[in-house]
Curated annotation (Swiss-Prot):
Keyword Zinc: no
Pfam families, alphabetized: Peptidase_C15
Catalytic activity, EC: 3.4.19.3
Organism phylogeny: Bacteria, Bacillati, Actinomycetota, Actinomycetes, Micrococcales
Record-given protein name: Pyrrolidone-carboxylate peptidase
Cellular-component GO terms for this entry: cytosol
Active site: 80, 143, 166
Function text: Removes 5-oxoproline from various penultimate amino acid residues except L-proline.
Leader sequence residues: none
Amino acid sequence: MPTVLLTGFEPFDGDTSNPSWTAVQEVRDRWDGDAEIQVRQLPVDFAKVDDALRAALAEVDPDVVISVGLAGGIETLEVERVAINVDDARIPDNTGFQPIDEPVVDGGPAAYFSTLPIKAAVAAVRTKGIPAVVSQTAGTYTCNHVFYLLMHELRDRPGTRGGFVHIPYSTEEAIGTDRPYMRMDQLATALTAVVRATLANATDVKVGSGSLD
């Protein structure tokens, strides 16, 4: 039976919750498929997140890794295509550290591509009536940092596939604000569809999912 590792982040930027962590726990708790789901929370801390991710990989020894993060302002689930070797933080992390134009990995390649079936995953989410797209940038904050480091670490795990998914706020974080959001049950359903599509597709489907901007 394959093992799937899902990671989410702790709260940051003044929020008291992070939907990425809540959502991956919901996926685990609702899961009834032919795979084991493990979840781990990662810190929003550039200095500590590397060791936390490496420890999770060593402990779980997964066949699939899907890291999940919050992108405030988006309205759809975004399955990321590429991670770049740049930390350029618009805001400080939870310790007050704010790297600007620093590499994620010294001497690492400029970018890594996801090894998830990203287009099949987007299609699977859409069949649930939930909007989803292939995203061409994971930003330059801790989400991209984790995505890049994950793919860098997976070079030594050729049998393990990995990638990153951005989600919007959930209802909990959006109350009393004008933030776009999805209900938590929608987020969990969408991420479950991503997991199932990944397990069902060893290679991706050939459909156009590019961007003109």
